[in-house]
A protein has these predicted regions:
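Short Gly/Pro-enriched loop/turn and capping motifs at secondary-structure junctions
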Residues: 68
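N-terminal pre-ligand scaffold of iron-sulfur
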Residues: 1-57, 71, 75, 83-101
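Short cysteine clusters
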Residues: 43, 62-65
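Short glycine/proline-centered loop/turn elements that form peptide/ligand docking sites
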Residues: 79
Length: 101
């Protein structure tokens, strides 16, 4: 697996979302209960940007049709999506965001 480094990453605040691009793929990054989480930024229902949605507990809610995904597993927790989203391993090291899938 390849580790992708994003230098100078100033991460989201607790309970917030941001997005980064890795090899042309948008990745939503969130800090939830002190844990950095990263998932594909595209909802599997209608391709809306999850980083523009909301965090509820340990899930992200799509802003378009309110589909809900678990940030740790990518599983669909509710709403119209039928397929899970991709999950990335995320870590902050030496001022850089490291993502791996």
């Amino acid at each position: 697996m390849t580790i992708h480094r994003i230098e100078g990453f100033d991460g989201p605040a607790e309970g917030d979302l941001t997005s980064v691009t890795v090899d042309g793929t948008k990745v939503a990054v969130a800090l939830v209960e002190g844990v950095l989480r990263a998932v594909d930024d595209t909802c599997t229902h209608m391709a809306c940007s999850l980083s523009e949605g909301d965090i509820e507990g340990t899930s992200v809610v799509c802003p378009c049709h309110f589909g809900r995904f678990d940030l740790a597993t990518g599983a669909v927790l509710g709403g119209p999506p039928e397929r899970p989203i991709g999950v990335w391993r995320a870590a902050l090291r030496d001022g850089a965001l490291e993502l791996e899938r």
